[in-house]
Amino acid sequence: MAMARLTPNGVAAALAGDTNLKPVLQIVELRGVQVNGAGVTRGERFRAVVSDGTAASSALFAAQLSDHARSGALRRGSIVQLSEYVINEVGPRRIIVILNLEVLVSECEIIGNPTALSETGSPIPNPTRVEQFNGAPQYGLMAGNSSNTTTKPSDNVPLFQNSMAGNSSNFATRPSDKVPVFQPTVQPSYRPAPNYKNHGAIMKNEAPARIIPISALNPYQGRWAIKARVTAKGDIRRYHNAKGDGKVFSFDLLDSDGGEIRVTCFNALLDRFYEVVEVGKVYVVSRGNLRPAQKNYNHLNNEWEILLENGSTVDLCPDENSSIPTQRFDFRPINEIEDAQNNAILDIIGVVTSVNPCTTIQRKNGMETQKRTMNLKDMSGRSVEVTMWGDFCNREGSQLQGMVERGIFPVLAVKAGKVSDFSGKSVGTISSTQLFINPDSAEAHSLRQWFDSGGRDASTQSISRDITPGASRNEIRKTVAQIKDEGLGMGDKPDWITVKATVIFFKNESFFYTACPNMIGDRQCNKKVTKSTNGNWTCDKCDREFEECDYRYLLQFQIQDHSGTAWVTAFQEAGQELLGCSATELNALKEREDPRFADTMLNCLFQEYLLRLKVKEESYGDERKVKNTAVKVEKVDPSGESKFLLDLISKSSALH
């Protein structure tokens, strides 16, 4: 057969660091190995011996090329052109890491008599039969159709052995008797690799490590550097374990090839780098320890993460602006979330159609946190509930609510949201979640055009069940009479409904309670305080006294529709939505006997509202009563209400 044209001295030139060369080489050996970390198998990678017909060396395929090997597109004898590769240095050894290639010939007989080139770049002397010595690496190269002869080994000795870096087991292949075989040889002591450009010895490299793509990082590298933009920066987290107290933070990096990786710093390194790292800026990061990514906390598409060490460097690139993207998304249409696994981490984008008020939730550990829900829809014909927790509620949540209330329905991109399958599918924020309002992306522009040109009125089906306070996507409309007739609130869990009704009466004698003003972290205590004999206010929860207290709504009013009347209780947020002022302001008007106090109440009477109610049976002494609590109050919008009624008529007509 005709011999394929391999690049002369291609292996030696590649090992010398000439990554501009795109050598044509042959794969003379290929095998898969399992990459393990933290006791967990991380996946299969492929190692090879590549040859230029004269010399050969070990090579490692990047993870993205594994499918080529598994499918058989790459095999022993394949001739390939390396279009992108880097050289990893592990001590004196060098390994070719292949990032991208083109298969020129899928299968071919082994060309020439390739001789193993030491991983330092120095050729190994002519092979002779020797025993393995002190576990040193052995190189065995299969010869092609050659007229050279060698002594046939005994049956007890494998004809081909290779112990490539990072694997302690040998791989043996016995060729037929007709194929000449080189026997294992002992690698000689290290000699400086020849310089193929200037024909002089290579001096010890003290220059900064060469920048490589994030996708090329692996634990077998010695010196490396990556150039990437910070896309996210976590808060400082403090912990306590058997070794004592500590602190940690992490940040995410994105490079120009789209590779992502997380970087983590502990204790003294946190003090060193926390103020240095800023979201949106580009840095060169070098000399860290690669460890298996903790997938319970790390959502990035990378099997490794970087742990910075004392010798690590993080250097700002102030002039870098456009070559590296500011963010990378992998958006999933909302209809695909229906099939996503519980706790999956994913990116979504949609138009915000509703935002509910912020509520306070008490966690199992007794700590309080903020919760806010909103509704997103996209062109897939589905909508989903997104739950914001903690600081997201008052930061992005307040901004989004203000926009929706002004009739502006923004596009929202959610990066690293967590899927929940509790009562349908929903997406919630976690500590590493990022929210982007009206991002400058093709997907966002496409959604905006769709929504403005008719998508606003397009019917959608929610993939989230309507059990959340204030949820409007699957709005459960009830009349006042149905609350009693259907036994709402009598079960183990509350019922959440929407009632269109008129406010007909206020109890204005007591419309507030005195609340604790103490701030616990970034949240107010809000527990009831009592006035002591010295005139101060005492909080039993905080065990403190205060000169002043806060006033929060505990508003009771009566509503009526065509079917009957009911009493409703509104706390701070809903009360403020109804009356248009805070409880502190309203109490001040009452104390001054200001006529505006009565006007505030009167202005709300005999007005029609949409009230989103939590209906739940509660105990009052020996008596059990159903309590209706307003979680959101809004005036009836004629346009929106007309659309709701038309949709209701349309659905009723379809059933008949």
UniProtKB/Swiss-Prot annotation:
<dbReference type="GO" id="GO:0051321">
    <property type="term" value="P:meiotic cell cycle"/>
</dbReference>
<dbReference type="GO" id="GO:0051026">
    <property type="term" value="P:chiasma assembly"/>
</dbReference>
<keyword id="KW-0539">Nucleus</keyword>
<dbReference type="GO" id="GO:0007004">
    <property type="term" value="P:telomere maintenance via telomerase"/>
</dbReference>
<dbReference type="InterPro" id="IPR007199">
    <property type="entry name" value="Rep_factor-A_N"/>
</dbReference>
<keyword id="KW-0862">Zinc</keyword>
<dbReference type="GO" id="GO:0007141">
    <property type="term" value="P:male meiosis I"/>
</dbReference>
<keyword id="KW-0863">Zinc-finger</keyword>
<dbReference type="GO" id="GO:0008270">
    <property type="term" value="F:zinc ion binding"/>
</dbReference>
<dbReference type="InterPro" id="IPR013955">
    <property type="entry name" value="Rep_factor-A_C"/>
</dbReference>
<dbReference type="GO" id="GO:0006281">
    <property type="term" value="P:DNA repair"/>
</dbReference>
<dbReference type="GO" id="GO:0009555">
    <property type="term" value="P:pollen development"/>
</dbReference>
<comment type="function">
    <text>Component of the replication protein A complex (RPA) required for DNA recombination, repair and replication. The activity of RPA is mediated by single-stranded DNA binding and protein interactions. Plays an essential role in meiotic and somatic DNA repair, but is dispensable for DNA replication and homologous recombination. Is essential for normal progression through meiosis in pollen mother cells. Is involved in repair of double-strand DNA breaks (DSBs) induced by genotoxic stresses.</text>
</comment>
<dbReference type="Pfam" id="PF01336">
    <property type="entry name" value="tRNA_anti-codon"/>
</dbReference>
<dbReference type="Pfam" id="PF04057">
    <property type="entry name" value="Rep-A_N"/>
</dbReference>
<dbReference type="InterPro" id="IPR012340">
    <property type="entry name" value="NA-bd_OB-fold"/>
</dbReference>
<comment type="similarity">
    <text>Belongs to the replication factor A protein 1 family.</text>
</comment>
<dbReference type="GO" id="GO:0003684">
    <property type="term" value="F:damaged DNA binding"/>
</dbReference>
<keyword id="KW-0238">DNA-binding</keyword>
<dbReference type="GO" id="GO:0007140">
    <property type="term" value="P:male meiotic nuclear division"/>
</dbReference>
<feature type="DNA-binding region" description="OB">
    <location>
        <begin position="225"/>
        <end position="307"/>
    </location>
</feature>
<dbReference type="GO" id="GO:0000724">
    <property type="term" value="P:double-strand break repair via homologous recombination"/>
</dbReference>
<dbReference type="InterPro" id="IPR047192">
    <property type="entry name" value="Euk_RPA1_DBD_C"/>
</dbReference>
<keyword id="KW-0479">Metal-binding</keyword>
<dbReference type="InterPro" id="IPR031657">
    <property type="entry name" value="REPA_OB_2"/>
</dbReference>
<feature type="zinc finger region" description="C4-type">
    <location>
        <begin position="516"/>
        <end position="542"/>
    </location>
</feature>
<dbReference type="InterPro" id="IPR004365">
    <property type="entry name" value="NA-bd_OB_tRNA"/>
</dbReference>
<keyword id="KW-0234">DNA repair</keyword>
<dbReference type="GO" id="GO:0006260">
    <property type="term" value="P:DNA replication"/>
</dbReference>
<dbReference type="GO" id="GO:0005662">
    <property type="term" value="C:DNA replication factor A complex"/>
</dbReference>
<dbReference type="GO" id="GO:0000785">
    <property type="term" value="C:chromatin"/>
</dbReference>
<dbReference type="InterPro" id="IPR004591">
    <property type="entry name" value="Rfa1"/>
</dbReference>
<dbReference type="Pfam" id="PF16900">
    <property type="entry name" value="REPA_OB_2"/>
</dbReference>
<keyword id="KW-0235">DNA replication</keyword>
<comment type="subunit">
    <text>Heterotrimer of RPA1, RPA2 and RPA3 (canonical replication protein A complex). Interacts with RPA2B.</text>
</comment>
<dbReference type="GO" id="GO:0043047">
    <property type="term" value="F:single-stranded telomeric DNA binding"/>
</dbReference>
<protein>
    <recommendedName>
        <fullName>Replication protein A 70 kDa DNA-binding subunit A</fullName>
    </recommendedName>
</protein>
<keyword id="KW-0233">DNA recombination</keyword>
<dbReference type="GO" id="GO:0006289">
    <property type="term" value="P:nucleotide-excision repair"/>
</dbReference>
<keyword id="KW-0227">DNA damage</keyword>
<dbReference type="Pfam" id="PF08646">
    <property type="entry name" value="Rep_fac-A_C"/>
</dbReference>
